[in-house]
A protein has these predicted regions:
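NAD(P)-dependent Rossmann-like dehydrogenase/reductase catalytic/cofactor-binding core
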Residues: 2, 6, 27, 259-326
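Short pre-catalytic strand/loop immediately N-terminal to key active-site residues, enriched for Gly-Thr
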Residues: 218-224, 276-281
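NAD(P)+-binding Rossmann beta1-loop-alpha1 motif at the extreme N-terminus of oxidoreductases
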Residues: 2-115, 119, 182, 245-247
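Rossmann-like NAD(P)(H) cofactor-binding subdomain of soluble oxidoreductases
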Residues: 75, 81-84, 91-186, 190
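Short acidic capping loops at alpha-helix termini that bridge into adjacent secondary structure
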Residues: 64-68, 142-144, 252
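Acidic, glycine/proline-rich low-complexity segments that act as flexible tails and inter-domain linkers
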Residues: 40, 55, 59, 198, ...
Length: 326
């Protein structure tokens, strides 16, 4: 099942007047009014993204630590998770026992109550899905919503792995969620029905100012563009630092200047209604230093290379999805 595209960024007038730092402050003010999610949450996987989601949700007041259980086989990760005040175990059996016990306390085992029962947040690596699904399948003896952030893994594959009672909401956050500046795509996936994504929307709204509801058919494109987007910027930063050193700066000087330049440019782009090419033209004087630099980028077809990279990433995502579906 799919939904129509829908984005929920700050409103246009507000976006013109404020930048990322201001938006972050506005979201912190909203945190004070946040209503905690009522459904208990079982996180399967306690890696970097799970930690980012938990930290953002806890800071926003959306997630209640006392209603969270994390299954993470790698005990080396437990120390960081313990600081969040959530229950943790290396055993999936413990997680299944916990989620079934909170269901018994809350009551409501029927299909119509699935959206209000404890939900599973699946945060393992895609190649770990078969084992993870086998470990928690007992939690899906009756209808339950599962939020999957597995890259390149269609919701139909997740449901097939967990059983017919799994109601899959697919989500794809990006790395900036770790500093509450992420952009996340979500969709109602296989077996899910209207309102099953309410908890997912609340969670990911807590770790970024934008949550986009997309058709699942667009997830590979979104992953290649926004999910992998931070990597492209880091790649650019790497080149800028190297160029600064070759031009005469020390590595420290070039590193510091690059980081602040990219941050400032991102904030300008966020605050402006102008297209990126218009902003670029505004700082590119004919015959000047920027024109000389951009000329080299144009000669090397840098714009085309970036666009081709995103298309290649999306194509790879489609390939991985086909492999996962076999």
């Amino acid at each position: 099942m799919t939904t129509q595209p829908h984005a929920e960024p700050p409103d246009r007038a507000h976006a013109q007047a404020t930048g990322p730092a201001d938006q972050l402050q506005d979201r912190h003010r909203d945190h004070a009014r946040a209503t905690p999610i009522q459904q208990p949450l079982l996180f399967v996987g306690g890696g970097n993204m799970a930690g980012a989601i938990l930290r953002g949700g806890l800071a926003a007041g959306v997630i209640d630590a006392s209603r969270v259980f994390v299954v993470e086989p790698d005990t080396a990760k437990h120390a960081d998770l313990n600081q969040l005040g959530v229950r943790i175990s290396a055993s999936a059996t413990d997680g299944v026992t916990w989620i079934n016990s909170v269901d018994e306390v809350a009551g409501g085992q029927g299909q119509r109550d699935a959206a209000n029962r404890a939900q599973v947040v699946l945060c393992v690596k895609p190649q770990m899905l078969p084992q993870a699904a086998a470990d928690i399948r007992a939690a899906f003896a009756s209808p339950r919503v599962v939020i999957s952030i597995l890259a390149g893994t269609p919701s139909s594959v997740v449901r097939r792995s967990l059983g017919e009672h799994a109601r899959v909401v697919r989500a794809m956050p990006n790395l900036a969620a770790s500093i509450s500046q992420g952009v996340t795509a979500i969709c109602l996936g296989d077996g899910a029905s209207r309102d099953d994504d309410a908890v997912a929307h609340a969670i990911f709204r807590a770790v970024g100012p934008m949550v986009m509801r997309l058709e699942e058919s667009k997830f590979d494109a979104f992953t290649a563009m926004a999910g992998s987007g931070p990597a492209y910027l880091f790649y650019l930063a790497q080149g800028m630092i190297e160029g600064g050193v070759r031009a005469g700066l020390s590595h420290e000087e070039s590193n510091r200047a690059t980081r602040q330049s990219l941050l400032g440019a991102a904030m300008l782009l966020s605050r402006s209604d102008q297209a990126p090419e218009s902003l670029r033209a505004a700082v590119t004087s004919k015959g000047g230093t920027t024109a000389a630099a951009v000329g080299v980028l144009d000669q090397r077809e840098a714009l085309r290379a970036i666009a081709d990279a995103i298309v290649a990433g999306a194509a790879r995502g489609e390939e991985l999805a086909k492999l996962a579906s076999k």
